[in-house]
């Protein structure tokens, strides 16, 4: 009887130890970057960046401190360069170990947006100021070169109807400048520039030409700097920029007008377990100081 009792007690102790061992996994430390250490991604980080001249890149490196003492862009030379929002999304969606950044309004389910410093990348958080990675959408033009049609289109963009489209498409609209009261217009407008602004402008174009069917609007996706140059040289009536214009660009005779606010979403592949990242970690990755996923913690 005593032997049987000892056997039962021994089994109970072993069972308790087994449960204790299993239970310890639930107490594994979670990294600052928001993922369990036992499931974190490992290996080389594939850094994906936009091209020089991209307004999204210019705003991103400025906001994240990826610049030197003279404000020069110091994105790591090992970064893979993409030349548009759509290519950035496709590249990140196809590379499990990649990280990139895109316009919040262009975000798709093909990639995962990370929280930055604990704040989710949403239009509401950009508007509230809790999501800090944000920038303006601007148009630019030479005021004295605008036709009546150009002026009418700009008035539509800034109207209640135009700003409703901005909000409906997931961007942050501005205070409208009244209702659109334009008359039937005819002619052609050429817009050129940011690949981040162009999806929004495409929606505005559709609504405007539905009211003004005799108007043709051509949208050229060429990047912010190229769009600003096109507006300066007269190759386009209106330039589109996802960054603020520089002093030298304004001194060339351009007028800049903000049409919306947009966040910049930091994105990874959907297979990446990471959910949260800090500004310092982003800076480390994009300057080349941090090269391994296991060091993002």
Residue ranges and their predicted role:
Residues 4-6, 23-297:
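Exported/periplasmic ABC-transporter solute-binding proteins
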Residues 5-13:
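Sec-dependent signal peptide hydrophobic core
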Residues 16-21:
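C-terminal motif of bacterial Sec signal peptides marking the signal peptidase cleavage site
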């Amino acid at each position: 009887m005593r032997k049987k009792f000892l056997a039962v007690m021994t089994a109970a102790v072993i069972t308790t130890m087994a449960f204790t061992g299993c239970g310890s996994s639930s107490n594994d430390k979670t990294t600052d970057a928001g993922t369990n250490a036992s499931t974190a991604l490992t290996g080389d980080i594939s850094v994906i960046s936009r091209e020089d001249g991209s307004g999204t890149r210019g705003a991103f490196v400025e906001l994240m401190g990826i610049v030197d003492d003279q404000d020069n862009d110091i994105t790591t030379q090992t970064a893979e360069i993409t030349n548009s929002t759509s290519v950035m999304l496709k590249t990140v969606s196809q590379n499990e170990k990649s990280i990139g950044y895109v316009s919040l309004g262009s975000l798709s389910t093909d990639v995962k947006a990370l929280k930055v410093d604990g704040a989710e990348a949403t239009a509401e958080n950009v508007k509230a100021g809790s999501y800090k990675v944000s920038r303006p959408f601007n148009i630019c033009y030479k005021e004295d070169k605008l036709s009546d049609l150009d002026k009418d289109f700009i008035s539509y963009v800034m109207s209640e109807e135009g700003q409703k489209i901005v909000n409906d498409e997931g961007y942050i609209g501005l205070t409208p400048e009244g209702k659109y009261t334009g008359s039937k217009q005819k002619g052609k407008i050429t817009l050129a520039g940011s690949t981040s602004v162009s999806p929004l402008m495409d929606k505005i174009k559709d609504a405007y030409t539905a009211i003004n069917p005799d108007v043709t609007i051509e949208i050229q996706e060429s990047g912010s700097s190229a769009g600003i140059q096109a507006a300066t040289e007269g190759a386009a009536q209106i330039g589109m920029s996802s960054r603020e214009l520089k002093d030298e660009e304004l001194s060339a005779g351009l007028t800049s007008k903000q049409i919306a606010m947009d966040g910049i979403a930091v994105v990874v592949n959907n297979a990446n377990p990471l959910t949260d990242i800090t500004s310092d970690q982003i800076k480390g990755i994009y300057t080349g100081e941090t090269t391994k996923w296991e060091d993002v913690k």
